[in-house]
Design a protein with these regions (language model features):
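Alpha-helical transmembrane segments and membrane-interface helix-loop junctions
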Residues: 1-158
Length: 158
């Protein structure tokens, strides 16, 4: 049986909660004419969490679409250096986005959500967790690229 990673598990849990809340709300609205007032906000928050944590999982597994037209222009001997350059750029960009997500979340922590009235930090923390995981994974890819160039074992498809 394949091992379930923590990011996969978290994304799946939030997606299941989203689907369950929406189905229960539809059932309550059409059969009892009594919709759950907070269902839409709960579903939205859970969906946001599933997107950002699921996005990190996809990044870890190299499942995002990419444009490899540029890599085919380089000789095979240069591809590992191009991959190192790409990993450096991605790590820097994701590091900046992670910093901005922390700054944004801290700034919005006192803003209550419209229906539940809870801190927006519960919603915005998904940015911190998602981009934090992507940053960790991108630094890991960067280290693997450096090991590959140095001639050590650094399988890029792990």
């Amino acid at each position: 049986m394949k091992k379930l990673e923590i990011d996969d598990f978290i994304a799946c849990v939030f997606l299941v909660i989203t689907i369950t809340v929406v189905i229960v709300n539809v059932f309550m609205r059409y059969f009892f004419n009594a919709p759950l007032t907070s269902a839409e906000e709960i579903a939205t928050i859970c969906f946001i969490w599933s997107i950002f944590v699921g996005g990190a999982s996809c990044y870890r597994k190299h499942m995002h679409m990419g444009i490899d037209i540029l890599t085919h222009l380089f000789p095979k001997s240069m591809k590992k250096y191009l991959e190192l350059f790409i990993n450096i750029v991605v790590s820097i960009i994701i590091g900046v986005i992670f910093y901005l997500s922390v700054t944004f979340s801290i700034g919005a922590r006192f803003k209550p959500t419209p229906v539940l009235g809870i801190s927006s930090l519960y919603e915005n923390a998904s940015l911190i967790v998602g981009f934090g995981l992507i940053f960790i994974y991108s630094v890991n890819n960067l280290i693997k690229s450096i090991k590959t160039i140095a001639g050590k074992k650094g399988d890029m498809n792990v």
